[in-house]
Design a protein with these regions (language model features):
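Short catalytic-loop micro-motif centered on adjacent basic/acidic residues
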Residues: 25-26, 55-57, 116-119, 187-188
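Thiamine diphosphate
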Residues: 1-111, 125-131, 198, 269-270, ...
Length: 346
């Protein structure tokens, strides 16, 4: 029947509200039951001729990791709806160690052909993705469902850059343009690590005379699927004009090395390598989770702003654009322990 009482925080801007026209099922620690309820609502369009729009919100580690077979079932029977992986990312649900810290839900999501998965950072990205999902599932009646990660960090959400909707849906758009230094770089980030990438771009500009464009990768998986589709077309149409993948169109004309950083295993962003012609470096969170602050975890997994800067400078040195002494200086300046154990081996 919905919310029949006035909550304690009703006087605040972000107060808790349940609309009587909707339905909220609070199942507690019951992933299998919750996913089954979501599947039931997500298939109501075919079983009862009623279009329902279910959102299942959960800690991201407790989705595909716990109920992967039910997720595969959802794809098989063409369920429609949204799975929202909350507090997503290896370094984000930070207080409870390896059990809760998700570094691979987006990789698992990509195993289901009709699951579209996204890792947004800003509210406008989430809004565009949900709007597009509603259009595809309920206006176009496509047999797909969505997995979208969500965070709970406090940070400023900017206005949506003009003309970015298409890139948000396709999986990549330029968020910020770099300055006018001769040495260039392209920094790709997603989810909670995008903000570290933005900070790294400012540091590169100010401290190392490197101008970096910042790209928000809302969906590496969608970029990969489109890239493979283009490759397949070109392979089977040898005499036709060659198509170019969207990621190639974004990156081919850009100068400098490309560095991608996410809160997930390196395998996630590594998928883009076939379509990036520049020197390409990937940072990720391989290994088990740890119990610590988000800031310290991002340092531990080597995906924070300082490691993004060092990775960029190292790639520039590898291609001969700058000297290795510059990389060594940055490592010393940021107090990075170059002899620390690889996180995946700890």
């Amino acid at each position: 029947s919905g919310q029949m009482y006035e909550p304690e925080d009703s006087g605040k801007v972000m107060w808790y509200r349940e609309d009587t026209k909707g339905q909220i099922l609070e199942e507690g620690i019951n992933e299998a039951g919750s996913m089954s309820e979501w599947v039931s609502a997500a298939t109501a369009y075919s079983n009862y001729n009623v279009n329902m729009v279910p959102f299942y919100i959960y800690y991201s580690m407790f989705g595909f990791q716990r109920v992967g077979d039910l997720c595969w079932l959802a794809g098989d029977i063409q369920a429609k709806g949204f799975l929202i992986g909350g507090t997503a990312g290896r370094t984000t649900l930070n207080g409870e160690g390896l059990q809760h810290q998700d570094g691979h839900s987006l990789i698992l999501a990509n195993t289901i052909p009709n699951c579209l998965s996204y890792d947004p950072t800003y509210a406008y990205e989430m809004a565009v993705i949900v709007h597009e999902g509603m259009r595809r599932m309920y206006e176009n009646q496509e047999g797909v469902f969505y997995y979208i990660t969500a965070m709970n960090e406090n940070y400023t959400h900017p206005a949506m850059p003009e003309g970015s909707e298409e890139g948000i849906i396709k999986g990549l758009y330029k968020l910020k343009s770099g300055g006018k230094h001769k040495v260039k770089a392209q920094l790709i980030g997603s989810g909670t690590i995008l903000r570290e990438v933005e900070a790294a771009a400012e540091m590169l500009e100010k401290d190392w005379n490197v101008s970096a464009n910042v790209w928000s990768a809302t969906s590496v998986n969608e970029l990969v699927r489109e890239g493979m589709d283009v490759d397949r077309y070109n392979r089977l149409h040898p005499t036709a004009e060659k198509k170019r993948s969207y990621i190639s169109q974004c990156m081919d004309e850009q100068d400098g090395v490309v560095v991608a950083s996410t809160d997930y295993m390196r395998l996630y962003a590594e998928q883009l390598r076939p379509w990036i012609k520049q020197r390409y470096v990937v940072l990720g969170t391989d290994g088990f989770g740890r119990s610590d602050t988000r800031e310290r975890l991002r340092s531990f997994f080597e995906v924070d702003r300082y490691h993004v800067v060092v990775a960029t400078l190292s790639a520039l040195a590898d291609e001969g654009t700058i000297k290795y002494d510059v990389v060594a200086k940055a490592i010393k300046q940021y107090k990075i322990d170059a002899d620390a154990t690889n996180p995946v081996k700890v």
